[in-house]
Regions:
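Edge/loop elements at the starts and ends of beta-strands within beta-rich repeat scaffolds
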Residues: 49-57, 69-72, 79-84, 101, ...
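N-terminal leader/targeting segments and the immediate start of mature chains
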Residues: 21-72, 269, 273-279
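Short, cysteine-centered beta-strand-loop-beta hairpins and adjacent loop/turn segments enriched
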Residues: 66-70, 95, 235-236
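Sec-dependent bacterial lipoprotein signal peptides
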Residues: 1-21
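Gly/Pro-enriched, hydrophobic low-complexity segments
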Residues: 155-265
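Extended beta-sheet lipid-handling architectures
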Residues: 54-61, 73-75, 89-90, 96, ...
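An acidic-aromatic
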Residues: 85-137, 141
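C-terminal low-complexity, charged extensions that often adopt amphipathic alpha-helices
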Residues: 129-161, 273, 279
Length: 279
């Protein structure tokens, strides 16, 4: 169980370091796409995955971690309140929570209940460690199946000019234009304009995060993926994660922020990373 939690913490920390960097907006218009102009298609994207309507999400979660060919599966809960917090709770047996990761605009809180320790780190500290501009809203968009521009909370009709857009077979590819350190690519599912993959990578290295979305089902008036597959590319050891979601609702009746018990020991982020790398 201890190894499972350490692998989970490793996945979460790595995701934070890979995503997000500031971008410069510029314009390029596309030809017609399946009878739609680029502007019309962009409006479909905003309607489906522009992030304007999903304010809360709660789901049962089965998380599968594959590190160097070794697979670990744990159950838990995913909770999100847009603009406030992302909570991942791990409760493998009888609904008893053993670990929690809480990400908010203020920073990241990781609680290891088995060892009664926790890490609390601000986004400023993460930026210094990663040497990149990190944004809460970028990570939130990945979990909510939303297209995004780093540093911007919501997209509008005017933001089409920030992307290159082209047909790739029956799908549509969008690339954020004129970024500096990171490259951002979104792959849309044909005329349905459902986001099927987000790809974030370093321009001067082979490191990248692929976040794929599958098994779309109705959630309110929209479609939402019940399966998310993450692949960390460029690492010495292959690392993948799969979120399988069920019982999805828009319930927001839960505490946004976790209060840590005084009995828990606060551990520095550097110490935690060192412990994980030693495993």
């Amino acid at each position: 169980m201890k190894l499972r939690i350490e692998r989970l913490l490793r996945i979460i920390l790595l995701a934070l370091f890979v995503v997000s960097c500031s971008t410069t907006k510029n314009a390029k218009k596309a030809d017609f796409i399946e009878g739609l102009s680029a502007k019309e298609y962009w409006e479909n994207i905003l309607s489906n995955c522009g992030g304007m309507e999903r304010e809360a999400l709660t789901a049962k979660m089965s998380l599968s971690l594959d590190v160097s060919g070794k697979t670990t599966r744990v159950n838990g809960t995913m909770r999100i309140k847009k603009g406030e917090v992302i909570q991942l709770s791990i409760a493998p047996l009888l609904g008893i929570e053993v670990a929690r990761a809480e990400i908010s605009p203020f920073g990241v809180l990781v609680i290891d209940r088995m060892n009664k320790r926790y890490v609390r780190v601000s986004f400023t500290e993460l930026q210094e460690l990663a040497n990149a501009q990190l944004y809460f809203h970028t990570l939130q968009a990945l979990f909510l199946n939303e297209i995004f521009l780093p540093g911007k909370k919501d997209l509008t009709s005017r933001d089409l000019s920030a992307f290159d857009i082209e047909l790739v077979g029956r799908d549509v590819r969008l690339d954020v234009r004129k970024t500096k350190r990171f490259a951002y690519t979104f792959l849309m599912q044909g005329t349905e304009a459902l986001l099927k993959e987000s790809l974030v990578g370093l321009k001067d290295a082979n490191y990248a995060l692929s976040w794929k979305y599958e098994n779309f089902r109705s959630l309110g008036q929209k479609q939402f993926p019940n399966t998310m597959k993450l692949s960390f590319m460029g690492l010495k050891k292959p690392m993948n994660a799969t979120f399988s979601l069920s019982r999805l609702t828009a319930n927001s009746n839960w505490e946004s922020y976790t209060k840590v018990s005084d009995k828990y020991e606060q551990v520095k982020l550097e110490d935690l990373i060192k412990r994980l790398l030693e495993k």
